[in-house]
UniProtKB/Swiss-Prot annotation:
A Pfam family the protein falls into: Ribosomal_L27
Keyword set includes Nucleotidyltransferase: no
MF terms in GO: structural constituent of ribosome
UniProt keyword annotations, A-Z: Ribonucleoprotein, Ribosomal protein
Family statement: Belongs to the bacterial ribosomal protein bL27 family.
Keyword Ribosomal protein: yes
InterPro entries: Ribosomal_bL27, Ribosomal_bL27_CS
GO cellular component: cytosolic large ribosomal subunit
Cited Gene3D superfamilies: 2.40.50.100
GO biological process entries: translation
Record protein name field: Large ribosomal subunit protein bL27
Length: 93
């Protein structure tokens, strides 16, 4: 038998790099237009007011303002950005 099995398995030892997904700007944080708000696979969070969506489902701010996380129906979550002046009204009501 010419098989060598004494050094352990060499078929393991690989792993892929992390995708670094998740929320990048949280509720109440000030953002500028173009800031990435959420990196995601699929639409766990939906785009709300003043938020764009990229081809990989990344949500980003379209205007300068403050981030708010809101509910859209029972189960949907949406992310909106309100200009600084309007943000106080949106958070209050």
């Amino acid at each position: 038998m010419a098989h060598k099995k004494g050094t352990g398995s060499t078929r393991n030892g690989r792993d892929s790099n992390a995708q670094r997904l998740g929320v990048k700007r949280f509720g109440g944080q000030a953002v500028i237009a173009g800031n990435i708000l959420v990196r995601q696979r699929g639409t766990k969070f939906h785009a709300g007011n003043n938020v764009g969506i990229g081809k990989d489902d990344t949500l980003f701010a379209l205007v300068d303002g403050v981030v708010t996380f809101e509910r859209k129906g029972k189960s949907r979550k949406k992310v909106s950005v309100y200009p600084a002046a309007a943000a106080a009204e949106a958070v209050a009501g």
